[in-house]
Regions:
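Intracellular loop-helix junctions on the cytosolic face of multi-pass helical membrane proteins
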Residues: 1-9, 137-146, 168-334, 357, ...
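Loop-to-transmembrane helix entry/capping segments in MFS-fold secondary transporters
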Residues: 43-44, 139-152, 336, 449-458
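Helix-loop boundary and gating motifs at the non-cytosolic
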Residues: 3-54, 295, 304-317
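C-terminal ends and interior cores of transmembrane alpha-helices
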Residues: 80-104, 381-410
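Cytoplasmic membrane-interface "Motif A"-like loop-to-helix N-cap segments
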Residues: 70-85, 143, 363-382
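A gly/Pro-rich, aromatic-decorated transmembrane alpha-helix motif that marks the paired
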Residues: 28, 62-63, 158-173, 393, ...
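Hydrophobic core of transmembrane alpha-helices in multi-pass small-molecule transporters
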Residues: 17, 88, 101-127, 400-434
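Central cavity-lining transmembrane alpha-helices of secondary-active solute carriers
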Residues: 48-70, 161-163, 344-357
Length: 512
């Protein structure tokens, strides 16, 4: 796979595996952790924190890009970012009491850890992508840039593939070790009971579920609610320890492979290298390239707003409306089950489908019919539109979230098949492979050399703006029919596709 690619590619890819594993352990459970620990269920507070955090990761990537571009110390910036992230994971892994005696202080402590992770990620993510792009500035490898970024992207998802399984496994193991059964809806019901907001219908369901997970009648529901919440949330805290360990491994891999990665700081003073790279771009050419990049950045905002619903509304849908009864892996000492498990499908499918997509584009290239990078992105937008239309069709007839809360949850017979989400994740993953790695390649190819880190940061900032809109997904989910929520995302992706299609010839000309 790495044949005919620069040696540094494998080091960069392996460095990213541990970091992504830790990151996606956290992202798989973050919203549900916030809801369970702080009682945010049925509100947008948890999603607001998730949105601000997810947005700041990509905004701070712009800051990280500026720092690396000015200092020319890309590898040093990346290393500091890795250490900061590990510190952040240690902070949120600390098992503070639940229910919290001082909820505000506990929330501030959690948010401080999230900020450390976000800032560290900002120093790491865009700059590592810039370094990978620099590997392909060598004319020997420049023709394989798209494939190189697809391989790099696949390795990102090798780490992410196991993250939800590890997160769910650690949490469920701890719940079982404390003598309880697992139930995804109980944390919300426990918080409703403790806050005195439970409806009579929900109370009946809560009493039944409490007896089910306790393996017998529960005499004191208040004591049960406090104990179950404490155990469930502590399981989440222990899952964050996995993220911290993964970061430690990533630091070790990066340091071991550091010498294989390019060092732009040295190239600045190497006049022969500068001469070999060709004459400086004219100001007009630089402007044209930057205009093209920002046009693409503006378009992909709406794709990321839709695609990153996997951690918000798609996870809510798995918890609230999906039949998880047969979606269980019993390992004896623990059961792998829960809404978070669906998030394993996207990275797993990326790993499985990337060689197929690379082979498909290679076959088209051999025939002289390979579409340009901008055209591939347009196709990806169309595929993403189809994914959300599938979700809308599969959600017909489901009650609103408000009605669901009053009922205390859906009866088993009314829950939808898990294949609806699995199929949607499959289609979205195909769309992602046409957009995300090729978008990175496009930025690397078009960005003026002196602004590589900045432009990679700007690409991630476009993602940040899309992420800042994630809370709208939760607002739609809580207030309009479920099928209509998915159609909002379908329309957003369709508009992105149409806009990109209108600019296609210009983008193809600039990227040549």
């Amino acid at each position: 796979m790495f044949k005919n690619h620069p040696k540094g590619l494998i080091g960069a890819a392996l460095s990213n595996i541990g970091e992504r594993l830790g990151f996606y352990v956290m992202m798989a459970i973050l919203v549900l952790f916030l809801e369970a620990k702080f009682g945010f269920g049925g509100t947008t507070k948890g999603v607001l924190i998730y949105t601000v955090f997810f947005t700041s990761i990509y905004v701070l990537a712009l800051v990280g890009g500026i720092i690396a571009d000015r200092t020319r110390k890309y590898k040093g910036t990346i290393g500091i970012g890795l250490v900061l992230m590990m510190i952040g994971y240690v902070i949120i892994a600390w098992p503070t009491p639940t229910p919290a005696p001082n909820k505000t202080l506990s929330l501030v402590f959690t948010c401080f850890g999230l900020f450390a992770i976000a800032f560290g990620n900002g120093l790491f993510k865009g700059n590592l992508q810039a370094v990978v792009g620099q590997l392909y500035d060598n004319p020997t490898y420049s023709g394989r840039r798209d494939v190189g970024f697809q391989i790099f992207y696949m390795f990102i998802n090798v780490g992410a593939m196991f993250s939800p399984i590890l997160a769910v496994g650690v949490r469920n193991w701890y719940v079982q070790s404390q003598g309880f059964g697992f139930n995804q809806t109980l944390p919300d019901l426990c918080n409703q009971y403790l806050s005195g907001t439970m409806t009579p219908e929900a109370m009946e369901r809560f009493t039944g579920l409490a007896a089910e997970v306790s393996r017998g009648p529960v005499a004191d529901l208040g004591a049960f609610a406090q104990k179950y919440l404490s155990v469930f949330v502590t399981g989440y805290h222990y899952a964050f320890i996995v993220a911290a360990v993964a970061m430690l491994i990533s630091i070790f891999i990066f340091m071991a492979n550091r010498k294989r990665l390019p060092d732009p700081a040295k190239k600045v003073v190497n006049k022969d290298a500068v001469a070999a790279a060709g004459a400086e771009m004219t100001l007009a050419e630089i402007k044209q390239r930057i205009y093209a990049l920002f046009a693409v950045f503006g378009v992909v905002i709406f794709f990321w707003f839709s695609f990153h619903q996997n951690g918000v509304t798609l996870t809510y849908f798995a918890k609230d409306y999906t039949n998880l009864e047969g979606f269980v892996i019993n390992l004896g000492f623990m059961k792998l089950e829960g809404a978070e498990m669906f998030q394993a499908f996207n990275p797993m499918l990326v790993v499985l489908l990337t060689p197929i997509v690379i082979g498909f584009f290679g076959w088209l290239k051999a025939k002289g019919k390979e579409p340009s990078t901008p055209k591939k992105i347009v196709i990806g937008m169309g595929i993403a539109t189809a994914a959300f239309i599938v979700m809308a069709l599969g959600s017909q007839g489901l009650p609103t979230k408000e009605a669901l809360t009053q009922m205390g949850g859906l009866e088993q017979a009314r829950l939808v098949t898990p294949w609806l989400l699995i199929g949607t994740y499959f289609i979205l993953t195909v769309a992602e492979l046409f957009i995300s790695p090729l978008g990175l390649s496009f930025v690397s190819k078009v960005a003026p050399p002196k602004y590589q880190g900045l432009m990679q940061g700007a690409w991630l900032s476009a993602t940040a703006i899309g992420n800042s809109l994630l809370i709208l997904g939760a607002v739609f989910y809580n207030n309009i029919p479920i099928w209509a929520t998915w159609m909002v995302f379908a329309v957003a992706c369709a508009l992105s596709m149409g806009t990109m299609l209108a600019m296609l010839k210009w983008l193809e000309r600039v990227s040549k």
